Amino acid sequence: MSSMTTTDNKAFLNELARLVGHSHLLTDPAKTARYRKGFRSGQGDALAVVFPGSLLELWRVLKACVTADKIILMQAANTGLTEGSTPNGNDYDRDIVIISTLRLDKLHVLGKGEQVLAYPGTTLYSLEKALKPLGREPHSVIGSSCIGASVIGGICNNSGGSLVQRGPAYTEMSLFARINEDGKLTLVNHLGIDLGETPEQILSKLDDDRIKDDDVRHDGRHAHDYDYVHRVRDIEADTPARYNADPDRLFESSGCAGKLAVFAVRLDTFEAEKNQQVFYIGTNQPEVLTEIRRHILANFENLPVAGEYMHRDIYDIAEKYGKDTFLMIDKLGTDKMPFFFNLKGRTDAMLEKVKFFRPHFTDRAMQKFGHLFPSHLPPRMKNWRDKYEHHLLLKMAGDGVGEAKSWLVDYFKQAEGDFFVCTPEEGSKAFLHRFAAAGAAIRYQAVHSDEVEDILALDIALRCNDTEWYEHLPPEIDSQLVHKLYYGHFMCYVFHQDYIVKKGVDVHALKEQMLELLQQRGAQYPAEHNVGHLYKAPETLQKFYRENDPTNSMNPGIGKTSKRKNWQEVE
């Protein structure tokens, strides 16, 4: 930790309080706990959590932290799954200040909605809601949006998503602060919007919503991953279509993982797909889905909107352990989910201090709550679950609906398996069930924490030309597992593989064995959850981090790199 004296820290904290107000500064460890603890795992100490209320306040807080030689950890929704939004242990060489951007949730629609300007606390849900009346959509819909994830958090971690045509979150237009080689804080405006010259002019103009159409330039820089549709169609490529450390997708704020303080990003929006249709496909032979994927990507004129895979085992786990999530979204809508996740986080933090309550009390309570309701999945889905091991949820739109239906009818005249055309309710519930799967494994581990060691969650991208996508583990690894849960974005070849580990197994050693197998298969990991503190960043990604943050003052240690100032290694 920092050698700064208690007196110096007191003066520093007084300065932060002066900048944002006492009510927007937390120093009590009990009150900062939910900001210091990760969504799934990871935690550490922090000197303070500060909540600036304007971009200009954020700039002044950053300057104060740089002057006082503090580590800066930018945090929005804290929904990351790989510990990248929180401190990691207590072996840092300086004090940590967490800057929460939740109050900075403005959104500016550019033109007729073709582009937007998102601020540090803008959520995917608020963006989706603002665009809906305009017939537009953001990069990502139902998924991260349901738990209150931020738009800029997605950009900084080039997060993925289920929408085949949109690729990972990406932009080349952003406004960010960088600590340069001399330890000086600088503001860089690459938004392509005329905002003035000084930080005060630039940030005040954004804070006061004084952007005019004439200020916005269109100079050819990209505000989404424009090339993704070509990459995902290349079924002979020996590389994945997308993964976090792809050097071609690292650009300033995009992929910076907190190594820059991002004030705003400019993003493209997408025309909402009309006349959508879900086809529910089942088979007992993985090669059938391989053929479907390869044919659609190589030959269909219309790319799918989405193509989601679920194995029977995760279908079952999600049916039982994702039921309350399913019902809440189905009955209350996605707009209530951030509130419930926030409430759960606060309740967990409070109950942790009460000895009377067992760990994971809220998870156990919500699990019991779900049992009170009748079966929630449509009969035809249940029938397909009984008949088939592998499930593909194929969503098409426009002319793609007829194209897919015609081809699937012909294909299943000779292929093992079958499909049915979903009613609107079946299609909605099928995708909602797939969404619930993402949290079901975590719920299982929480409810059965006395019986299982942990959950090992891997997030992988396979080579586009890989035909052996379905994993077969060697017996010495398989014997250490209670459940193997496979689901993912099948057209993109991005899989989430959650392993429930038997009690007493060394999870860290098991993970290393798993990653070695993935390396042998030519897979890249992580695919869309980013390295956080759980994965080692490849050298190209480490180089990108060092370029963005030469003094290693912003989110140090990310990707298992040095936590020390100026990237010094521990002797």
What is each of the regions a protein language model found here?
Residues 30-32, 36-104, 118, 138-139:
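Glycine-rich N-terminal segment of FAD-binding domains in flavoprotein oxidoreductases
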Residues 51, 81-105, 161-184, 259:
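Structural signature of FAD isoalloxazine-binding scaffolds in flavoprotein oxidoreductases
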Residues 89-98, 103-104, 109-151:
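Anion-binding (especially nucleotide phosphate/pyrophosphate-binding) glycine-rich loop
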